[in-house]
Amino acid sequence: MSIHLGAKGEDIAPRVLLPGDPLRARFVAERFFHNAYCYNEVRGMLGFTGTYKGVRVSVQGTGMGLPSHSIYVTELFQDYGVQKAIRVGTAGGLQEEVALKSVVCALGAATDSAINARRFSGMHFAPTASWSLLRTAVSVADEMGTGVQVGNVISSDVFYDESGSWRLWARYGVLAVEMETAELYTLAAKFRREALSILTISDHLVTGAVTSAQERERSFTQMIEIALEAIIQ
């Protein structure tokens, strides 16, 4: 057991999907896993393990934002020996060509958070995806006929941002805004693990378009299928 996860060491698989929403973790387990069981209910942050196409895979909710994500990812890497982690979540589109409901694989992640500034004593670290996972996910998506867009995202500390700072990030070609990827990639680098963030565009800051609950579920399912196929390779 770790401080925030009530699992025994063998309860968590070496491959883990990371939705922010613990209810999405349950959805993944019920929809895609065979013989799924719940290994964590601490703080309501549900975690499940099962098999997908004969391979053991876990799914663990992480909450919203870099600090919460950091806690769970650190414990998964440090205390449970997780080797591959794929974040699956939603993001806001920052480019017109990144359509609503499309899937984005985050190549790199900028951030307005002070976490890395503190961690690296004011110096700047470039958090990037694991090439092997990224390449596999893109290949899987192409084979599925889905296709993904690959590029940088911005991991922000602020959800209700009235400053309009997203326009600056958009000017530099950043595809989407979300709240966790920069920390996932930084921790993967620290622990020498593989990590990738696969995101569904649920709303669009440029066009103002938003998805319905039903549309989010369908597009989320597509993203999960890509993530599962990639992580078992």
From Swiss-Prot:
Pfam families: PNP_UDP_1. A purine D-ribonucleoside binds at residues 4, 162, 178-180, 202-203. Homohexamer; trimer of homodimers. The gene is deoD. It catalyses: a purine D-ribonucleoside + phosphate = a purine nucleobase + alpha-D-ribose 1-phosphate; a purine 2'-deoxy-D-ribonucleoside + phosphate = a purine nucleobase + 2-deoxy-alpha-D-ribose 1-phosphate. It is an enzyme of class 2 (transferase). Coiled coil: none annotated. The keyword Glycosyltransferase applies. It comes from the Bacteria. GO terms for cellular component: cytosol. GO terms for biological process: purine nucleoside catabolic process. Its EC number is 2.4.2.1. Phosphate binds at residues 20, 24, 43, 87-90. Catalyzes the reversible phosphorolytic breakdown of the N-glycosidic bond in the beta-(deoxy)ribonucleoside molecules, with the formation of the corresponding free purine bases and pentose-1-phosphate. InterPro entries: DeoD-type, Nucleoside_phosphorylase_CS, Nucleoside_phosphorylase_d, Nucleoside_phosphorylase_sf. Keywords: Glycosyltransferase, Transferase. Belongs to the PNP/UDP phosphorylase family. One of its GO terms (molecular function) is purine-nucleoside phosphorylase activity. This is Purine nucleoside phosphorylase DeoD-type. PANTHER family: FI09636P-RELATED (PTHR43691:SF11), URIDINE PHOSPHORYLASE (PTHR43691). The active site is at residue 203. It comes from Treponema pallidum (strain Nichols). The record marks 216 as: Important for catalytic activity.
